[in-house]
Amino acid sequence: YKFAKKVEKSGLGACNALSRDICVADKTYQENVCKFLVDTTKEFDISYWKLDGFSYRPCTNSKHHHMVGGENDMYYYSEMWQGWIDIFKSVRQARAEEGKDLWINMTCYVHPSPWWLQYVNSIWLQNSSDIGFADNLEHQPQLEREITYRDGRYYHSLCTRAWQIPQRYLYNHEPIYGTEAKVHYTDEEFEKYLYFNACRGQALNELHLSYTMMNKTKWRILSKVVQWQKSNFDILRNAMLLGGNPEENNVYGYFSWNENGDGIIALRNPTDESAPLTLTLNRLMGCPENLKNVNRFNVYNEGAGENFDSYSYGDKIDLTLKPFEVKVLQFGKKDRRYDYLEAVDEFTISFKYSSNEENCAICENDDVKITVEDGCLKIKCDSAMLTSSGKITGGEHKITVVREKNKMVKLYMDHALDGSVYDAAAKGEIDTKMESDALEFSAVNKATSYEDIVALKRVLTKAVKRRKK
């Protein structure tokens, strides 16, 4: 209010007494704002403007340089918005003259109508706080409360009120991980949070992050998720919300498909109980009717191995979501999870260990070395080093070592992930030809977890038999 009065006193605009802020319809103010935006855009090569706070309440002062009156103050609003449309056009023209693009984000006090998309690029959700936390369940993690709150606002907008605007044009403030937000997430929670946010399909992500809260792992997670989101936006841009209201403890998700049969399905259970469900790949799920023989890949699917089945239109997928579980699954002829990376060779080494030897060699060549030292499993893969979390002597263990296309090296112990490391300096190609006396030793040029080794061997065996025929 003080700033608005100062603007008015200086002759640069007017003060709206009802909303106690600047009168954004005042012609003098609009002329000054337009000049400021155009000049600043040119001087500082600005490509993004976030215009926050239009008209909270109409200005009824007839002495200001705008119309007043009409039903629901329609004359004021009509003239105000016409003036701002001219401003949007002027700023865009300034960028266009230099052959450059401009993103305009309209935030507070805007009708979320697709009509605006001829002038702006995104519109704030309107029915939401910057950040919020749902109260659908007691004693749930803070992360779950935040995700449920945001998706509850999406449900209210897109389902209850049935807004007719594609989700890619909605701005939602995420991701938020800053000191003022009073949140704290583990690295695992941070990854889950970012992936599910990306699947809402919004084209604009403002990174509301406090660098003091970030560590190396979180920066790498952020980079990985943002690059995956960008390289798959031709799919995610078609996201739609399906399922029930998460604030009423219903399973829900976001479904995205493009015309080529590439798809992304993100599912979430917002409750503290397991939830079985069946997905049918049909038009209701956004699938193109010509969907045929696509593969399924895990983007975010904790503890689950890769799936070797193929899927076509009308197929059903039976799943069970654990309490608060998120699954992000990708479909397509091609594995597009790592399109943004200079992918490296992938492989899987698996074997059983049932010896009491505290020190022995499992396998070794110039690039890969697996040993048991002081009872613990030691893995050297190119420049990556990984050690098991505990001793493997004194019983039988199923061991799997995986290098993925994204340069992650993972150790699975008895069907569960035991440890992982990111090899930033990984070579593109490494030698996996080696021999070993270990039980059921196998090395294949494909990344998969232990429980899928048998299935993979079966697939490879069938392929060899077909070639022989």
Task: Please describe what each predicted stretch is.
Residues 1-44, 137-141:
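Active-site-adjacent "subsite" loops/lids of carbohydrate-active enzymes
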Residues 33-67:
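Active-site groove signature of glycoside hydrolases
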Residues 338-385, 392, 408, 443-464:
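Extracellular glycan-recognition modules
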Residues 397-410:
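Localized edge beta-strand/strand-to-loop motifs within extracellular or lumenal beta-rich domains
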Residues 421-452:
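Flexible glycan-contacting loops in extracellular carbohydrate-active proteins
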Residues 84-303, 316-331:
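Active-site-proximal substrate-binding groove within the catalytic cores of carbohydrate-active enzymes
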Residues 308-339, 465:
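C-terminal beta-strand-rich structural cap/linker in extracellular carbohydrate-active enzymes
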Residues 15-34, 68-83, 181-183:
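The substrate-binding groove and active-site-proximal loops of carbohydrate-active enzymes
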